[in-house]
Swiss-Prot record:
Family note: Belongs to the ponticulin family.
Protein name per UniProt: Ponticulin-like protein C3
Glycosylation site list: N118
Lipid-conjugated positions (GPI-like-anchor amidated asparagine): N118
Signal peptide: 1-20
GO cellular component labels: lamellar body; membrane; plasma membrane; side of membrane
Keywords, in A-Z order: Cell membrane, Glycoprotein, GPI-anchor, Lipoprotein, Membrane, Signal
């Protein structure tokens, strides 16, 4: 019985801390090729969501066996600003939430853009959520030790 309660409290703490992760509303792709229509206007993929910087990007496939390399899907109808898009065989490597890699003769830069569109949250809400998650985790740990 004590083990079940401890396990339940630990699951609650882990769930609370996972909800505190920063979310991203979109990511931008810029292109260094002077002949590309992307060079003056960044490709803004608003339909995509970065779950974490270089962690998991919707419509971008992770390379097997790597947590930092991703392959682009065809942007297709999602992309209205740029006709010249990379194919699914092209890769980029993330470093600290930003990435630049030469694909052929073109360098693509990928940057995750934090989601600040929720009007009920202020800029300080991230630190508040992290603090609350830490407090929940500490409470769960103390409860487990008391059992």
């Amino acid at each position: 019985m004590k083990f079940t309660k401890s396990l339940l409290l630990l699951i609650v703490a882990v769930f609370a801390s996972s909800n505190a992760a920063e979310t991203f509303s979109n990511f931008q792709v810029t292109n260094s090729d002077a002949n590309s229509p992307c060079v003056t206007t960044p490709v803004e993929l608003k339909v995509n969501t970065c779950q974490s910087a270089c962690g998991s990007i919707l419509n971008v496939l992770p390379v097997t066996g790597s947590t930092s390399k991703f392959t682009f899907n065809q942007f297709g109808a999602q992309d209205t600003k740029c006709a010249a898009t990379p194919t699914s065989s092209n890769e980029f490597t993330c470093v600290d939430g930003k990435s630049k890699v030469a694909i052929g003769s073109t360098t693509y830069s990928v940057v995750c853009v934090p989601d600040k569109t929720n009007s009920s949250e202020s800029d300080s809400s991230d630190s508040t959520r992290i603090g609350a998650s830490f407090a929940l985790f500490a409470l769960a740990l103390l409860s487990m030790l008391a059992l």
